[in-house]
Amino acid sequence: MRKRILSVILAGILIVGLTGCGNQKTTDSKTNDKTKNETVQKSKGNCDVFECIKKLSSDTTYEKVNEIIGFEGKLVDQSKEGAVSTYKKYEWELTDDTSITVRLDEFKGKVTAQISAEFPNEMIKNDKVDFSKVDKLKEKINSSDGLTYEEFVEIVGGVEGTLYNVTTFSNKYTRVNSEGKSLNATFNSNGKCTIFNGIV
């Protein structure tokens, strides 16, 4: 009888012990996932990659970009000495997988900027993005009235594009659906789409 009682007690202790270990593992796993996500998402600057590019324009300067982002960019490329048209390209690494790059071109004393946002497509996946009406986009872009940004948004499911490139003459936007397929579109200063391409 004593042996039976002892066996039951030991079995109960073992079950409690295993349950406790299981809960601890789950908690640790959730904590690690949360920490990982926070590390990926937290920007080193004053804004994340999507906010930063919206605050920049083609007439910006290196000093202005530093002020907006919050730290100095790293020089990653430049023109050869003696070139008629010179440029310098800087990068601001905001996280391990997102950054802003700005190419400053100087010609006859005038400086213009080309701005790009780098980020993984996974960050902007959206199951509301609909590429089933691409033919309608083709029809509109070739029409006499052209294709406006608002019309583009409506045709692809009502989803706003993610700005990823800014120049003097155009803005480029991208969208990614739930399957990871993307569609990029370029709009001129008049708000008309001049070209779109991607994997749909």
Task: Give a label for each model feature.
Residues G17-G20:
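C-terminal motif of bacterial Sec signal peptides marking the signal peptidase cleavage site
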